[in-house]
Amino acid sequence: VDRFIGKLDRGESMCHQMIMGAGKTTVVAPLLALLLADGKTLTMQVVPHALLEMSRNVMREKFSAVIRKPVFTFYFDRFMKIDSALYSKIKKSREMKAVVVASPTSVKSFILKFVEQAKNLEKEKEAGTGGAKKGMLGGLGFMRDKMSKVIGKKKFNEVSMGEAYYCTETLKIFRSGVLLLDEVDLLLHPLKSELNW
């Protein structure tokens, strides 16, 4: 735990291997969460989907008696909207010194949603300025009109801008936070951890 804290103070990442049953999930992760969730830094624990329930229960068990600390679950998929409610929850989690438990799929989906939002805004900008009129993306002008009808009075780009803003603000909290990866060999495996959208 001291080594992890020392590396964090120097702004470095660290990967530490421990044998099975040595207390990675039940001792080290809760201790790090206790020390790192200080109200200024979001502490997020990412575990494989199969271990999500168990890891969340371990955290809740550790932080429900003597030392009380909220434990929340971050769930996100590509069809969810990024709005002020999601941003407020993440911000409140940081302020409450909570531990946020998530699966790698949720974190990757959020990052891909950010990329998608940036791409949509770029397309909208090109369509609005008259650029990129050719090819498959050239029809964005009529897509924008259709989306405006679906949304109603709000313009498509206003909705996209709002979503992109909250996406960026949430990502800032993530980037200034700490990510605890449990079972890192599974989470970062190039063949087993891919997320196809």
Residue ranges and their predicted role:
Residues T25-V27, T41-D83, P104-I111:
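Conserved Walker A/P-loop ATP-binding site and its immediately adjacent core
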Residues D9-L31:
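Walker A/P-loop
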Residues A33-L34, K108-W197:
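Signature of the SF2 helicase/ATPase Hel1-core->accessory helical subdomain module
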